[in-house]
Design a protein with these regions (language model features):
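Structural motif
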Residues: 12, 131-132
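Residues that scaffold the ATP/ADP-binding catalytic core of kinase and kinase-like folds
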Residues: 20-22, 71, 141, 158-159
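PIN-domain endoribonuclease scaffold, especially VapC-family toxins
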Residues: 47-106
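Hydrophobic/aromatic ligand-binding patch that stacks against planar heteroaromatic rings
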Residues: 50, 122, 141
Length: 170
């Protein structure tokens, strides 16, 4: 009988993190970097951490996926087939990491921005340990109901430091 490993920590990434992961610099979309930081793109490094399916479980909502796709298609003019491929990759990554996609009820009104409150709805619904965002309004709410809201470079750095410490203990 094997003993299960530690449970993955639930995390929520803001839409801006998901967009910046493929919109800034050299996107490592086809092979997310691991361990971070390796790409020079902290948002991509965040996805690299989750893609490893080791420590963190990514949670998404239909709203977050739709908004990510909308920004990529309308603002950044990303071709529809590339948007679809990316959203499918995010959904697969969330599932493989131990997270998934859920449609939380809209109950949070703590922030001044409706979109930010949808991120917080998801964090509350899945019991996220932390939220990762590049939005100053959202990070300004940290800690929100006891949950840190940190920026992508902090998350990537924290995960990298944790992995280095584990390797030294072996």
């Amino acid at each position: 009988m094997s003993v299960p490993g530690p449970a993955a920590v639930p995390v929520v990434f803001d839409v801006n993190v998901l967009v910046l992961a493929v919109a800034v610099g050299e996107s490592p979309f086809r092979s997310w970097p691991s361990p971070p930081p390796t790409s020079g793109n902290p948002s991509a490094d965040c996805l690299g951490v989750v893609n490893d399916a080791a420590e963190f479980a990514l949670w998404l909502s239909p709203h977050i996926l739709a908004h990510t796709g909308r920004v990529l298609a309308t603002v950044l003019k990303t071709p529809d087939d590339e948007v679809d491929d990316y959203l499918r990759a995010l959904a697969e990554m969330a599932d493989a990491s131990g997270g998934g996609i859920t449609d939380p009820p809209q109950t949070v009104g703590d922030g001044p921005d409706w979109e930010d409150n949808r991120i917080l709805d998801l964090a509350a619904a899945v019991g996220a340990f932390l939220v990762v965002s590049a939005d100053a309004d959202l990070t300004g709410l940290s800690p929100w109901r006891g949950r840190p809201i940190i920026e992508p470079p902090q998350f990537a750095s924290m995960a990298g430091a944790s992995r280095r410490a584990r390797r030294r203990r072996r």
